[in-house]
Design a protein with these regions (language model features):
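Conserved HGGG/HGGXW glycine-rich cap/lid loop of the alpha/beta-hydrolase fold
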Residues: 1-43, 64-66, 79-84, 92
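Flexible "cap/lid" subdomain of the alpha/beta-hydrolase fold that forms the substrate-access gate
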Residues: 35-77, 83-233
Length: 233
């Protein structure tokens, strides 16, 4: 069972599936809940988020496996967003998901169970890094904070350069083809360190994602020479 990432679809696995099938596996790659033409949930910013709880996504994975007449799968493979769902599948139902492969996004493990909350109620704490990023000489914001804002969805769907060119620039900016990509470990979770990340991760505070990646749009010659994500793929 192959679970795709964001912003992707099951189509992302089209080059992987034949190789696995040739090895003798029945390969299944669904569009995950909230992606593609899936239904039964609200895309409205104020919509109910309960349908997207992880256990519901695990149930979706199990439902797909069972729908194809299998009681278990050899492996559940998750990439990016799918790498969040896949380990929970394996943890929740190891009898169904016999092994797990996690790609791109590391699994942080199961959260600690709150203890002695009757005497010491848990308090919601704010991560100061967002405030610190905004206070930098060059004000910044974390991309996940931006994605959680009301305007983000419309910003990307209505990108001035068009959705196709937005995604072309977005993927180019994140790929090894972008010459300024230089992966290296940060010294800590601080605004000063996070500001060293490329702008697709830590954006300028007053820019949308469409504006951010437009600055890194590859040339027509670069696009024509691209073999990782060609337009005719």
């Amino acid at each position: 069972l192959l679970l795709h990432g964001f912003p992707e679809l099951a189509y992302s696995w089209r080059k992987v599936m034949p190789a696995l099938a040739a090895a003798g596996y029945h390969v299944i790659a669904p569009d995950q809940r909230g992606y593609g033409r899936t239904t039964g949930w609200s895309a409205d910013y104020d919509g109910d988020l309960h349908p997207f709880r992880l256990m519901n996504l695990v149930r979706d994975a199990m439902g797909v496996v069972f729908a194809f007449g299998h009681h278990s799968v050899e492996a559940v493979v998750g990439h990016d967003f799918g790498a969040i769902v896949a380990p929970w599948c394996a943890l929740s139902r190891p009898d169904v998901f016999r092994s797990v492969v996690i790609m791109s996004a590391p699994f942080a493990g199961t959260p600690a169970i709150p203890f002695d909350t009757v005497n010491h109620p848990a308090r919601v704490t704010d991560d100061p890094v967002h405030r610190d990023l905004a206070a930098l000489p060059r004000p910044r914001k974390h991309y996940q904070w931006y994605y959680a804002t009301r305007a983000a969805n419309a910003d990307m769907h209505g990108a001035p350069q068009g959705l196709h060119d937005f995604l072309r620039a977005y993927y180019h900016h994140k790929s090894a083809d972008w010459t300024a990509n230089a992966p290296h470990p940060l010294q800590g979770w601080t605004a000063t360190e996070l500001a060293k990340l490329p702008t697709y991760y830590v954006m300028d505070r007053d820019k949308t994602m469409a504006q951010t990646v437009a600055e890194e749009m590859p040339s027509a010659i670069e696009i024509a020479a691209n073999r990782w994500l060609p337009d005719n793929a």
